[in-house]
Amino acid sequence: MTEEPLSAAWLTERTIYLLTLLREKRPLVHNITNLVVTNTTANALLALGASPAMVEGVEEVDSFARMADSLVINLGTMSSPRAAAMRLAMAAARQAGKPVVLDPVAVGALRYRTELARDLLEAKPHIVRGNASEIIALAGDGGGGRGVDSLVSSTAALEAASILARRTGGAVAVTGATDYVTDGTRLIGIANGHPMMTRVTGLGCTATALIGAFAAVEPDPLVAACAGLCATGLAGELAAIRADGPGSLQVEFLDALYALDSAILRDAARWVLP
């Protein structure tokens, strides 16, 4: 993990550096994601500068997870074969030393996926990204969610996030009106984003995938998560300026990711520091 002081200026410059590095290296991001967002996720990764792959067959995930630069696991649409593929891929990625990002969609609302998420947590993913209800439920403190929606503010989940981060040895991101990332010691808030983003399905899942892209080029999981959430939030803000509603927001979001650069980051990245 970095020993640099996490000032707002440092975080912005690090995000700029990582975005440049990501676009040079075009990391291969292995996604086992949900059926609702596969197209959106792949296009967002391409727009950012990464290379997406949606390999989920149990016959292929072991070898592909070792080949890829990072692995993103999303529990949005569950089935027994997908669960088996997730377990195989996570084990392979961990053995190969590749970063793993877990998105525990609807954990706390449905028992099967809650049990699966807790099993996957034992493999110690580098980064966990969820809404407040999901993070609280994953930490074992109940929930209050309605699937992908959260009835709890992101600040209410900070203690649970810290517990999870210490348990995994990685970072936990809690997304909401303000996003927060902690590794159990450090805490960073990201205040970028726009309310219209909640009217488009899958942008939270997309944020997880973008975190996976940054994790492929940044060894510090907290910094990788911060960079991914900042990029997502900024793209959402820029898209909302040009969009007439949720439909056009989806298109504008991809264009904004593609256009994201150092000038935009220096001008508009908003960090919330303790």
Curated annotation (Swiss-Prot):
GO molecular function, one example? hydroxyethylthiazole kinase activity
EC id: 2.7.1.50
**UniProt keywords, alphabetically:** ATP-binding, Kinase, Magnesium, Metal-binding, Nucleotide-binding, Thiamine biosynthesis, Transferase
Q: Where does substrate bind?
A: 54, 202
**Which GO biological-process labels does this protein carry?**
thiamine biosynthetic process; thiamine diphosphate biosynthetic process
Quote the catalytic activity from the record.
5-(2-hydroxyethyl)-4-methylthiazole + ATP = 4-methyl-5-(2-phosphooxyethyl)-thiazole + ADP + H(+)
Q: Where does ATP bind?
A: 129, 175
What cofactors are annotated for this protein?
Answer: Mg(2+)
Give the record's family classification. Answer: Belongs to the Thz kinase family.
Reported function: Catalyzes the phosphorylation of the hydroxyl group of 4-methyl-5-beta-hydroxyethylthiazole (THZ).
Q: What is this protein called?
A: Hydroxyethylthiazole kinase
Per the UniProt entry, what species is this protein from, by scientific name?
A: Granulibacter bethesdensis (strain ATCC BAA-1260 / CGDNIH1)
**Organism lineage:** Bacteria, Pseudomonadati, Pseudomonadota, Alphaproteobacteria, Acetobacterales
